[in-house]
Amino acid sequence: MRWESGKTRRQEDDSPWVDTHVHILPPRRMAGLVRWVKKFTPGFPVSEDITSDEILASIRDSDIPYFFNLVFPLWEEETEDLNRFNRDLCADIPEAIPFGSVHIETPDKGGETRRCIEEYGFMGMKLHPFAQRFPAFGPEMRPMFEVLNEHHRPFLVHTGFDVFYGMYMDLEEMEATVRDYPDMQLVAVHAVFPRFKLVHRLLAEYPNFWLDMTNSISCMRLYEDIKDNRDNLPPMATSLEMDDVRENYDDFFRLFEDFPERIMYGTDFPVGFGYHPALLDDLRFFGFSRDVEEQLLFKAVHNLLSRCGHPDTLASLEGI
């Protein structure tokens, strides 16, 4: 079942999994997120009333030793409160690695970013430009980029799935941002799905460019299941960009051959394509080598945090 928590380390030598994409939000925002997912996922079993404790219990049931907790304001006026929420929440959760966020209308983006990094101890910042309804790489965001570049910190940004969202991202601006802020580590969340040829080139050209394969692994497995039966597509598959996936198919596998040390694997938990055991099965469907699997599950995260000056964050994990 896709929606059952359970162990992901079933054998003693199974790799630990650092989940780089979790959303524990305030109750009102959590309920709104679940309601949104239910609009396009018939039978989605997660309750709108799911609590932080329930999310955390499932994460722990699935043997997740660390996770990135990601927030982002939909309105400017919730920015400071949302970042304080993440600070207070994660202060009591040793597994949590918090990220902050800003809104395009946040008056002092540099100041809020500095507060998140220097005062709250956050690892970096996150934007979801499609949900927040503003461009991620315009000049308005430069104050945030400058602080992240100064501190060598990561910027996680939603990329890809343009057809599903009915929106467009300027990928030339994204590349310019990677180039202009070489000490800021830019993590393309969802790996600009399905533009794998592009991200392969960016990984080759820019050492500060990284991928998080959240949802993209599951979508590629879905593609494998339905590519020969396009007249009977399941919910959501109509926006899978089948033709583009086919054109980028070989490049998907080249990513793991050439750059596994900069590719991570998050889940969007609890509103992704399933709970942790099912999403681990999606990864293993492709039969990657043990070394590649270890990179995706925890070693690439360690590489990222080490690049950001925090090599000891995951030091307790075996194999680091």
Please tell me what each predicted stretch does.
Residues 123-124, 137-264, 318-320:
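Catalytic pocket-lining loop regions of alpha/beta-barrel enzymes
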Residues 1-20, 29-66, 115, 250-254, ...:
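Mid-to-C-terminal alpha-helical segments outside catalytic/metal-binding sites
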Residues 66, 74-169, 218:
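Active-site gating/metal-coordination segments in enzymes
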Residues 79-91, 182, 209-210, 279-287:
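Short, electropositive alpha-helical surface patch
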Residues 14, 23-51, 62-65, 206-210, ...:
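Active-site gating loops and adjacent loop-to-helix segments of metal-dependent hydrolytic enzymes
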Residues 50-56, 81-86, 109-112, 171-174, ...:
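Alpha-helical scaffolding within the catalytic cores
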Residues 21-27, 158, 190:
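Histidine-centered divalent metal-coordination motifs
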Residues 21, 67, 86, 98, ...:
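Divalent metal-coordination and catalytic microenvironments
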